[in-house]
Amino acid sequence: MSRRHRAEKREINPDPKFGDLVVTKFMNAIMLHGKKSVAESIVYGAFDAVQSKLKQEPVAVFHSALDNIAPHVEVRSRRVGGATYQVPVDVRPERRQALAIRWLIAAARKRNETTMVDRLCGELMDAANNRGSAVKKREDTHKMADANRAFSHYRW
């Protein structure tokens, strides 16, 4: 990792259908091998499925799912005097969003439905209702931070 300067944040445009920057970030994270149109069809297909099943605004469901997945604290390793401690630290808002998106996609890819649209739709609905493996990942992260609260004075 270069220590010269911090990489500049790239400007991204909101998605054409909903005009939401977070949806664009989500599409970019789903995209494989530069196939943006495939990622768009997956995300929009999942949003349409969510709207038909829940009769709610899909972007609102998406944002509530991300809020339910995003961790508030996580543990980071800190080496002190030959011992490595798992120190709980607060998560920055940008990282919270990035982790939530990453965990949502990973959980959707692990599901057993046939198409990615169905998997993503199911995981979005589960996460919006505080269920699913992405929410479980957040709970596990919070439990780990709570268990290591004794080492919180090692923060940096």
Swiss-Prot record:
Signal peptide positions (record): none
Gene Ontology biological process: translation
GO cellular component, one term: small ribosomal subunit
Keyword Disulfide bond set for record: no
Sorted UniProt keywords: Ribonucleoprotein, Ribosomal protein, RNA-binding, rRNA-binding, tRNA-binding
Classification via Pfam families: Ribosomal_S7
SUPFAM superfamilies tied to this protein: Ribosomal protein S7
Molecular-function GO terms, alphabetical: rRNA binding; structural constituent of ribosome; tRNA binding
Keyword check for Ribosomal protein: yes
Family per similarity comment: Belongs to the universal ribosomal protein uS7 family.
Record's subunit section: Part of the 30S ribosomal subunit. Contacts proteins S9 and S11.
NCBIfam families hit by this protein: rpsG_bact
Function, as annotated: One of the primary rRNA binding proteins, it binds directly to 16S rRNA where it nucleates assembly of the head domain of the 30S subunit. Is located at the subunit interface close to the decoding center, probably blocks exit of the E-site tRNA.
Protein's name according to its UniProt entry: Small ribosomal subunit protein uS7
Species assigned in the record: Rhizobium meliloti (strain 1021)
